[in-house]
């Protein structure tokens, strides 16, 4: 059994995810897959983790987060659409994002860590949908 990890730039868009999946599927011994949050698609782009940090900060300031949630979701949606994943299946990702502010966190540091961790969590869910 082999464990493989893919970083953010390897999972930044549909084409990169496709290359990662080809690597995974080329060896049946690759059974454990560890994924990072999607990284930058180009030099001017923003990593999902940075968008989640912004989302957390906006939540802590009680600011409207509709736009940042949509921006984050659209990144996952774009990758999902590349593989033909239906919007109905992808909706769970948006639902998880929308639920983050309503969870109980012991303090702001915990909230920040939880928001950031969702980059990987949501990407793992997306890759599972694709596979």
Language-model segments: what does each one mean?
Residues 1-130:
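Nucleotide/pyrophosphate-binding catalytic subdomain
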């Amino acid at each position: 059994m082999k464990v493989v990890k893919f970083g953010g730039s390897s999972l930044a868009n549909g084409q990169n995810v496709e290359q990662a999946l080809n690597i995974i599927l080329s060896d049946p011994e690759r059974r454990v897959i560890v994924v990072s949050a999607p990284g930058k698609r180009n030099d001017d782009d923003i990593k999902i983790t940075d968008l989640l940090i912004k989302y957390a900060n906006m939540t802590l300031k009680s600011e409207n987060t509709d736009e940042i949630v949509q921006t984050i979701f659209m990144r996952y949606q774009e990758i999902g659409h590349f593989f033909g994943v239906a919007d109905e299946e992808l909706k769970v990702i948006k639902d998880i994002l929308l639920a983050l502010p309503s969870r109980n966190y012991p303090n702001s540091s915990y909230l920040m860590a939880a928001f950031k961790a969702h980059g990987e969590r949501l990407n793992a869910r997306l890759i599972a949908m694709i596979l």
